[in-house]
Each structure stands twice: as structure tokens, then as C-alpha cells.
Amino acid sequence: GKCFREDGVNEFVEKAKTADGFVFGSPVHYASASGMITSFLDRAFYGKSALFQGKPGACVVSCRRGGASAAFDQLNKYFTINCMPVVSSQYWNQVHGNTPEEVKQDLEGMQTMRTLGNNMAWLLKGIEAGKAAGVSFPEREPAQKTNFIR
């Protein structure tokens, strides 16, 4: 399948075929990820979820006050529902600033981002080393659909 809208999702899906891992980011609006990233990920993952399986995923959120953990959780669900290893850091993957200069002043957030990058690189190297040693990602069982109406 292909999304009928021609706004970048299909182009992203093509690039996702050869990607080793993913980092998605969003500002926090009303304690959730932006509607734009949510719509984008809904469409990309719904149509081509198999492309993402086994590839590490991480998300980064940006906010000043509450809502970071809710948005972080919302974005991580795309990874966990699609059998993707989730890359973590030393805290929620959160940083704040309205400009690049302001973000650089968020010392804790910047450290969290560096740790996230290091952890992503380590996991990608580990996956490659595993493949070279003959260890592959577990084969998925056929999905079982539960219907409580019998």
C-alpha cells in the first residue's frame, strides 16, 4: 500500500526501507505529540509496519513544562507495537528551547541527547555484530486477533 496523500509520507517510507534505525521528534502540545507527527506516523506505520520491525527507534520531545512524559510515551508506542527495540537515555528524551541557541543552554537536555545518540550507535553496532555472527531478529508469529464477541 501507498498513502494517497502526496505530502512526504511515501517518500519517507521509501527511505525507511534502507534505514538502520529511526529518531522522531515533536514539540509537546497539550501533553501530547503534535498532530502533524502523529498523523505522519499513523500513516507510515499503518501502511508499512513490517518495514520498521527489528529496527531501533527513539523519540525526542521538546517542552518547557508538563506533558513530556505523556508525549514521550505516545511516540514510543509506535515502536513497541511494531516490534522495534526502543532506545533509551538517562532520562526521558526531552530537551527545551525555542531556538537552537536556547536548546544549547539546556545542559541536562543536551546531555540526555548525547547519551541517546551514544546508545543508538551502540545498539546499531550490536545488531550488526549479531547479524555477522548469525544472530537475526526473532521471527514474528502470525498475529492473533482477539474478538470478545463470539
PLM features: what roles do these ranges have?
Residues F4-Y91:
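Helix-loop-strand module that forms the ligand-binding subsite of alpha/beta enzymes
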Residues P85-R150:
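Glycine-rich phosphate/pyrophosphate-binding loop and the adjoining helix
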